[in-house]
């Protein structure tokens, strides 16, 4: 929970796009940890799904930073602004990835966080509410980033000269966008790949918990 809240607040203060995305990655891994330690089916499934989803989304966002860095050699947010007016294809894909990162329904970023929170609410209302606040912070820094970079005011004259994404960049980014949207709308194939393993893990945990309780209670009964 501390990792989620703290790194989300740090991300809000970043002026460097790459650092902002890096801190957001730490926050998202906080949800993975939270889901695992709920020891619930929903929480653990959400953690696994979140790891896979975040791998796609973070890779896409880092690639997006690399694309504009290759053109203007700057990762600073204030270097950019109004990119939608000059490189619309890039801007459209960046928007998809940013919305996925904040957990918009219909993207792979939604289901993982939803399942983790569902598992957390079963165990601790306070922890779940704090994690939900982290989701709000995540939406804040991703929307803040998108507003300034994609829809902000263009103060740098060099932006007007840059080229939109080339064919190889289109292939990479569109492929990532496809899987992010596909697993957002149709998560079942991915969920089925680890459903058996999660059920087995939960079963083993519950068995171990029962056995430990039996061992604890036996000395008490013998002493009586």
Segments (PLM) and residue ranges:
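Cytoplasmic/organellar membrane-interface segments at the starts of transmembrane helices
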Residues: 87-89, 142-213
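Hydrophobic transmembrane alpha-helices and their helix-loop junctions in integral membrane proteins
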Residues: 1-147
């Amino acid at each position: 929970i501390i990792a989620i809240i703290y790194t989300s607040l740090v991300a809000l203060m970043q002026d460097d796009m790459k650092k902002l995305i890096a801190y957001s990655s730490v926050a998202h891994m906080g949800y993975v940890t939270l889901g695992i330690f709920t020891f619930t089916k929903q929480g653990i499934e959400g953690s696994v799904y979140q790891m896979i989803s975040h791998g796609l989304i973070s890779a896409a966002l880092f690639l997006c930073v690399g694309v504009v860095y290759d053109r203007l050699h700057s990762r600073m947010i204030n270097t950019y602004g109004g990119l939608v007016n000059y490189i619309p294809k890039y801007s459209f894909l960046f928007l998809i990835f940013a919305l996925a990162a904040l957990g918009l329904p219909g993207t792979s970023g939604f289901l993982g966080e939803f399942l983790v929170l569902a598992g957390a609410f079963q165990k601790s209302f306070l922890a779940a509410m704090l994690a939900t606040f982290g989701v709000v912070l995540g939406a804040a820094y991703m929307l803040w980033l998108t507003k300034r970079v994609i829809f902000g005011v263009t103060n740098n004259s060099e932006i007007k000269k840059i080229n939109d994404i080339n064919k190889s960049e289109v292939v990479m980014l569109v492929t990532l966008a496809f899987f992010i949207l596909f697993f957002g709308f149709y998560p079942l194939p991915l969920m089925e790949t680890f459903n058996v393993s999660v059920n087995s893990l939960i079963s083993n945990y519950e068995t171990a918990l029962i056995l430990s309780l039996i061992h604890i209670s036996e000395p008490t009964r013998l002493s009586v």
